[in-house]
Amino acid sequence: QSSDLAQWNRLKEIFTSKSLQMVSFTITEKGYALQKADGTWFPFVEADIKNGPDKATGAMAVLVAMLYERYPIALVSMDNCSKNGAKLRESVLTMAEEWKKQGFVDDDFITYVSDEKVVAFPWTMIDKITPRPSEQIADDLEALGVEKMQPVITGKKTYIAPFVNAEKPQYLVIEDSFPNGRPALEKGFGVYMADRNTVNLSERMKVTVCLNPVHSATGPLGVV
């Protein structure tokens, strides 16, 4: 947050580096939301709109404030939701437009962030199951000398831990749209670079053929 000047300046230093090619996001689908169900702004979003880039606090406001400082870049949402890049782009453009109304930015900035040849929002599809933290893995890590690895049960009866355990199969399909170049992402295990249509079809296949129908079919058996 911009209330911590040292962190804010460090973030700006990183974001304005010409070598920066991409910024990835895993903030859940709710992290892109600017409005409540009734269409009104969340209070922190309303404050960000009124206060402008120099006092941004929310994730989307901070991102747009950083975009005001820099060069071509790809903003890559890796959250597990359909058309994630479009959701991120909509939030960025909404915040930018609201700042324009307040006089914090001008038309040139809106044109800049709207041009996907300059600021891209690649779509991605992630398919990897991460079940609740395993006590066995926690024990194994502690046996290796890593301290305080045991899962914690929250007040909402969810499990959290300092580690993540997951199934071995994994698929990450990324739209190959990077205005300032990119790392060799395809060298990663289970990572595939593709066009937007392929990413969208992969997402559709995951939720209509490979994953949800199987869960829906086997769920009643578990109840029985």
Residue ranges, per PLM feature:
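Substrate/ligand-engaging "lid" and interaction regions
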Residues: Q1-V224
